[in-house]
Amino acid sequence: VVVDGLKEMCFGSFEGRNYIEMEHDPDYLAWVAANCESPCPDGETKAAFSERICRAFSALVDKALADGEELLVILAHGGTQMAALERYALPHKDYYEWCGPNAGGFVLDAADWADKRVLHLVKTVQYTRETDV
């Protein structure tokens, strides 16, 4: 199921371009200098992105728990993971500290979700061709 609210940040005019292509772009340089907190031209701010992610993420967790699910798997971009974990995961970490491995993610425990709206980090995972699913 595709959840629109969990899509990666809208990078506006930066979309589809890499840092080498933009290394002399004044808008890009200003955005990086602001720690990527300012809005991308025609795109989202990190704050708006994080708020969108957290609304969709919490709704998914609420629904899964209400439906009696014991396992919820969300496959998402790294920025999406970082935004949700910065808000909801324990131990508390900064957005950028939640940057996981490529093809990786996190296993979380929702035991305290209903009362405290937090998820406990169980482990970090990284999938490879050899990973046994």
Give the residues covered by each predicted segment.
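A generic local structural motif
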Residues: 25, 58-60, 93
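Generic beta-sheet signal
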Residues: 70-78
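Generic structural signal for well-ordered alpha-helical scaffold segments
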Residues: 50, 54-65
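Glycine-rich phosphate-binding loops at beta-strand->alpha-helix junctions
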Residues: 80-84
